[in-house]
């Protein structure tokens, strides 16, 4: 069956109304949970093969997050799927107004390779809860994980309802040539532009979860020991292959040396004296990215790190960096942290705001005025004060970007809303019919109209 037939089969199935019943949605979420738990061993093995992820990191950053999202959404789907009563203006008396949630239809979820299980499955949870049919396209760069997900889904779901299309660029293009009712894409800006262009032909709404160069600021009031540990965690988790990882560092000149020493100490504590020999240290996804990252390091001064072998690059801190340095011209997506110092916060803000809006921003400070200044003057998707990356691991806030770092947000209720169209409905009583809206227009009715509409 070719891709056009796969997508049409889903449109035909959605048209039957089979996905509208909330009981059926809940049953589908339950089947997904059971399948993930059944396949957890194979998922672990696949992520070990693709990225050298340990079972601990796989559960913390992939499987556990999906199961948590399933639990949260499963408990609330029935309530979210009900009509929502809203007030009605006096001018429309006697009426009842409500918003009726309906699924978009057939949605395409395109996932990346860096967290290949979590970033594929979390959007799917929201799409299923909202009553959609789903076509999932995982990344060809993580083939073992893609294969396990395809097997899991094929064994668990009717392919008319939820199916996986494996493959590379040819399959991506073939999918984007089809008419979907919603497209959810996670990846880079280059492909995102292709997705938007293809979606525009059908006026298909999209969510774009992208990336960018996310700054981290450490000011002179920060708790340096805490900042260093949390910065090292957020930057070097998954070998820096995290879309919201700190991409570059601004540290106040007065605490620069202390922070550097603490960062190096924490890297040793996390990964040992030789991180490249650490069994739990994640590898770079492929040789193309391995060579690209080494090219960004070449010619720069490494305070620590810089070693590379067998597809791994050690956690690396660079100094002597300026805004014109090659490494500051693109998202790094690797375990390399360029560092710049500052004395004037206004200069840092001017630097960040002169560049495309980042997916995340991280600020380490104990000064409330500094916190408010940065949050109010810098636009970014989301972030943390006195921590890194953990803002994405909550169902109570949307995760997403702004500007070049993306559009739309998801997690928890925001995932349900992303894949839901809310129909605005007004139901009018028959026993009362105010006359002023009808022709012929009279002076008396005009006065009444002005009483209601002002």
Predicted features by range, described:
Residues 3, 22, 40, 224, ...:
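Residues at or immediately preceding the N-termini of alpha-helices
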Residues 90-226, 264:
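Rossmann-like NAD(P) dinucleotide-binding subdomain of oxidoreductase/dehydrogenase enzymes
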Residues 217, 268, 309-454:
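Conserved C-terminal structural/oligomerization subdomain of aldehyde/semialdehyde dehydrogenase
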Residues 14, 18, 33-36, 40, ...:
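Structural signal for hydrophobic packing residues in well-ordered secondary-structure cores
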Residues 6-8, 207-210, 238-243, 274-276, ...:
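Short, flexible turn/loop "capping" segments at secondary-structure junctions
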Residues 1-98:
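N-terminal Rossmann-like NAD(P)+-binding subdomain of aldehyde/semialdehyde dehydrogenases
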Residues 190-322, 345-346, 385, 453:
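ALDH superfamily catalytic-core signature
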Residues 25, 70, 131, 162, ...:
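Residue-level signal for inorganic ion chemistry
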């Amino acid at each position: 069956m070719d891709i056009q037939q796969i997508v049409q089969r889903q449109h035909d199935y959605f048209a039957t109304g089979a996905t509208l019943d909330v009981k059926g949605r809940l049953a589908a979420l339950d089947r997904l949970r059971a399948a993930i738990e059944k396949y957890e061993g194979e998922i672990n093995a696949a992520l070990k093969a693709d990225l050298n992820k340990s079972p601990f990191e796989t559960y913390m950053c992939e499987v556990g997050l999906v199961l948590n999202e399933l639990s949260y959404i499963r408990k609330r789907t029935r309530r979210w799927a009900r009509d929502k009563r809203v007030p009605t203006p006096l001018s429309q008396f006697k009426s009842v107004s409500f918003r009726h949630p309906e699924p978009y239809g057939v949605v395409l979820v395109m996932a990346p390779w860096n967290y290949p299980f979590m970033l594929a499955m979390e959007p799917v949870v929201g799409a299923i809860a909202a009553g959609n049919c789903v076509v999932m396209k995982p990344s060809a760069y993580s083939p073992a994980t893609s294969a396990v997900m395809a097997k899991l889904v094929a064994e668990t779901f009717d392919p008319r309802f939820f199916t996986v299309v494996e493959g590379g660029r040819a399959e991506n293009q073939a999918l984007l040539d089809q008419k979907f009712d919603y497209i959810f894409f996670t990846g880079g800006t280059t492909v995102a532009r292709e997705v938007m262009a293809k979606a525009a032909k059908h006026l298909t709404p999209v969510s774009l979860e992208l990336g960018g160069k996310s700054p981290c600021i450490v000011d002179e009031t920060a708790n340096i020991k805490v900042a260093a540990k949390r910065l090292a965690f957020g930057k070097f988790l998954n070998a820096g292959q995290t879309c919201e990882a700190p991409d570059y560092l601004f540290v106040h000149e007065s605490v620069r040396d202390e922070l550097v020493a603490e960062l190096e100490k924490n890297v040793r504590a996390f990964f040992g004296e030789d991180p490249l020999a650490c069994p739990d240290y994640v590898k770079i996804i492929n040789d193309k990215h391995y060579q690209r990252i080494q090219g960004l390091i070449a010619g720069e001064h490494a305070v620590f790190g810089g070693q590379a072998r067998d597809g791994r690059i050690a956690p690396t801190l660079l100094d002597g960096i300026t805004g014109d340095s090659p490494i500051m011209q693109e998202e790094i997506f690797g375990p390399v942290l360029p560092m710049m110092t500052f004395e004037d916060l206004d200069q840092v803000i001017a630097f960040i705001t002169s560049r495309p809006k980042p997916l995340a921003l991280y600020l380490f400070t104990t000064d409330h005025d500094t916190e408010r200044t940065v949050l109010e003057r810098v636009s970014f998707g989301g972030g943390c004060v006195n921590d890194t990356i953990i803002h994405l691991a909550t169902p109570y806030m949307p995760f997403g970007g702004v500007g070049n770092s993306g559009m739309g947000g998801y997690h928890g209720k925001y995932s349900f809303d992303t894949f839901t169209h809310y129909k605005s409905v007004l139901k009018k009583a028959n026993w009362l019919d105010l006359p002023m809206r009808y022709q012929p227009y009279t002076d008396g009715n005009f006065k009444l109209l002005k009483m209601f509409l002002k």
